[in-house]
From Swiss-Prot:
This is Large ribosomal subunit protein bL19. Keywords: Ribonucleoprotein, Ribosomal protein. It comes from Geobacter metallireducens (strain ATCC 53774 / DSM 7210 / GS-15). InterPro entries: Ribosomal_bL19, Ribosomal_bL19_CS, Ribosomal_bL19_sf, Translation_prot_SH3-like_sf. Disulfide bonds: none annotated. One of its GO terms (cellular component) is cytosolic large ribosomal subunit.
Amino acid sequence: MNTIDMLELEQMKKNIPPFKPGDTVKVHVKIVEGDKSRIQAFQGVVIARQNGGIRESFTVRKISNGIGVERVFPLHSPSLDAIEVITRGHVRRAKLYYLRKLRGKAARIREKKYVAAH
């Protein structure tokens, strides 16, 4: 491993839950306004994950007042406070950009079913 990889490995966050495109997540973001800071939640469906390592980012889409809103979050950013996985979705694509064209019930994602071990 070279020195750049070692430096990046030190700066990467360790407490990131595993999530994939199709999962519904709640992202807690630190917002600084002047001298005050607060945490704002952004809940939506993960439609893409890009790159890898310290440069990794993911895109979350939600519908707010009938308008689609997408935000791209750097995965290892210090402004991310926490990521919660709300539901696991079952999709057959890595990039869910087709959801941008769908409205209403057509934009639903099937929930992944788990079989309990005996």
